[in-house]
Design a protein with these regions (language model features):
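Charge-dense, helix-prone N-terminal extensions
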Residues: 1-109
Length: 109
């Protein structure tokens, strides 16, 4: 799997606007994982991104257009969701998803 370099740059710019601090990216699952310290909160793929959510945010997130459970190997992976590129075509939407990912690092519940 590859990743969308344009979406990665937009995500890094959005994280800077959020004042997220030092975020790095590295290869994970064939995507570019966004890391805060040694913990991943999102990853950019070729036509979607995955985001880790707080458990309490998961049910509402799954009702949004372009969002589904992240299911590598056919089974849902914890509180991770997959968000299509269309669902993050606007920068405010992208920032909202990245902010949700960062919240999951502070409190998983």
């Amino acid at each position: 799997m590859s990743y969308d370099a344009g979406l990665l740059q937009r995500a890094l710019d959005a994280l800077d606007q959020l004042g997220a601090g030092p975020v790095r990216h590295r290869s994970v699952f064939g995507m570019r994982g966004l890391m805060f310290g040694d913990r991943m909160f999102a990853a950019i793929g070729s036509d979607s991104m995955i985001v880790k959510l707080r458990r309490a945010e998961l049910p509402a997130a799954l009702t949004r257009p372009g969002v589904s459970a992240f299911t590598p190997g056919g089974s849902p992976l914890g509180n991770w969701v997959e968000v299509t590129d269309e669902a993050v075509a606007d920068d405010p939407e992208l920032r909202d998803w990245l902010a949700a990912g960062l919240r999951s690092l502070r409190s998983p519940d």
